[in-house]
Amino acid sequence: MCIRDSIDYFVAGVGSGGTFTGVAKHMTTLGAKNYIVEPQGSILNGGPIHAHATEGIGSEKWPTFLDRDLVDGIFTISDKDAFNNVKLIANKEGLLVGSSSGAALQGALELKKHIKKGVIVTIFPDGSDRYMSKQIFNYKESNDNE
């Protein structure tokens, strides 16, 4: 992995908080701002708890390994956006990623709307091969996930 000195923003989902905290500590030394991505239904951004289809990220409580002092902001992403990005990444980049990766991309795209310029780094933590039996490329919204 090549880390550049010109990274301005780090965006990633949080499960246990370990990956986010470890990477964010380093990104902070580069002067980067760190943003969490969570699915709707997770409580990190103060929203109500409910079921979500985006797997691997999101929480009903603050994760033990997440260092809150490293968090500069939180983006809450719909399942629809996460799964649409799974298809987009496969079609445009040929990468088979899972829904938490789709959410990470959406978080980076949301951040891009709020900044004038800068280098954004994100992590695609999962592959779609884990979710083929769940029809990851044929996601259908339910009324409670939007």
What are these regions (language model features)?
Residues M1-S6:
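Conserved small/polar residues in nucleotide/adenosyl-binding loops
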Residues A12-G15, I36-E38, V121-P125:
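Short beta-strand segments
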Residues D8-V11, D72, G118:
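Conserved acidic residues
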Residues L96-S99, V119-F124:
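Conserved active-site loop/cleft motifs that coordinate metal ions or position small ligands
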Residues T28-S99, H114, Q135-E146:
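Active-site/ligand-binding loops adjacent to catalytic centers
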Residues I7-Y9, A32, L95, S99-L105, ...:
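Terminal helix/beta-alpha structural elements that buttress the NAD(P)+-binding lobe
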Residues G13-A24, S100-A108, Y131:
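Short glycine/serine/threonine-rich phosphate/pyrophosphate-binding segments
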Residues V121-S133, F137-Y139:
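A short, charged, Gly/Pro-tolerant segment at domain boundaries
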